[in-house]
Amino acid sequence: MSIERKVQNETGRNPYRIGANVLLLVAFFLLFHPLLSRGSLMYQPTISHWLTAGAFVPLVLRPWRRNHPFAENHTRLYAAVLLVHDVLLFLSAAAVSLILVEYMVKGCVITLKQSFFQGWICYVAVYAAAYLICGNVRIGVCLGMAISMIHGMIDHYVMLFRGTPVMLSDIAAIGTAANVSKGYSAPIELSVLRAAAAAVLFCVSVCLMQRSFKVHKRWYFRRLFSLPCVLVLAFIAYTGIQTVGTGLAFWQSSRQYSEIFYFLRCATSSFVKQPEGYSADSLSDAQSEFTGKQGTKTPNLIVIMNESFSDLGSVGALETNEDPMPYVHKLMQGQENTISGQLTVSTFGGGTANTELEFLTGDSMAFLPYNCSAYQVFIKSEMPNLTSGLDSLGYQTAAIHPYLSTSWNRTNVYRFFRL
């Protein structure tokens, strides 16, 4: 028997594996610790120290193997030690996921302590759910970390290209995103590589833990234990923001919140509620206020929407050596037979179909979930709109778009709108 094998049998530890663990921990520390000096945490050294300790304690305090004298003589106590270690490991992994995702998306750590702990609770729920599915600590950590990193990378590139975070309603827009993404290039940035490398090192360190003793061998016991934890954490994540007396401000940037918390809270607001005071009687009363004579002329109606066109001077002082839009400004200054004005839309950084919806139907996006795609989520049948009665007046209607017809579900929506 070799000396290394003899040492392993007597001590329960493989010296080569211990050396690999040390190297992994050093590499993880060099990648992870500098991230804590990003953002406001650099002004909160106490939090930085606690986070560092929290990330490394479960990795350093490894449980003994079963053939260790303590484990053999105190089986129940050792099982309790393993359980505590597993809980610490999940809490640590949740903090690591939060910091890596925030750094990947924002380039820094979120600014508010309250927002940090809200996001941390959400990630703890994710890891508890992962353990509920697989019933294995190592696989649960790797699965939870993979979910976190995938969400972080998607959010990173959505923010890069669109300027707004990914939402649950974006799932319905995957086809449109695939069409649009053909015109973009996705650079592999240092923040993504650094976060991914730290996540891999953390997972490898967890997988190399020497452990042959299980807290409980029966799979249904593990799931029965983790199920209430998931439910409690989900309840805390859902209602916690009201408990502390704050609210989610959709008009504010997601930089005020952690990415996971912002995503989940927006997802819970993705259900349409009937506006206050809305009824058929109220609509009839509003309609009765508008009277007029039936027109006899049937002019051609042409509507052009150009999402890349805007008068930048209307939102601030724009100094140029010559007027960039002389004809447009001439029309807006009272040209004969011209009615002009400025249009304010509810979309930013894309979402042109929502502006189409507001124009064609007169319905406001204010009553729909924030940042949703109404064409893809809510328009499932014919809906009254500007073109609904034109066929009875002898008009023929058509819609022309210069890009793929599958984007924003326009093929079906235009059919529902009789275009």
Region roles according to the model:
Residues M1-S2, E307:
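PLP-dependent class I/II
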Residues S2-S254:
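Transmembrane and membrane-interface helices of multi-pass
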Residues G240-L419:
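Soluble catalytic regions of membrane-associated enzymes that act on cell-envelope
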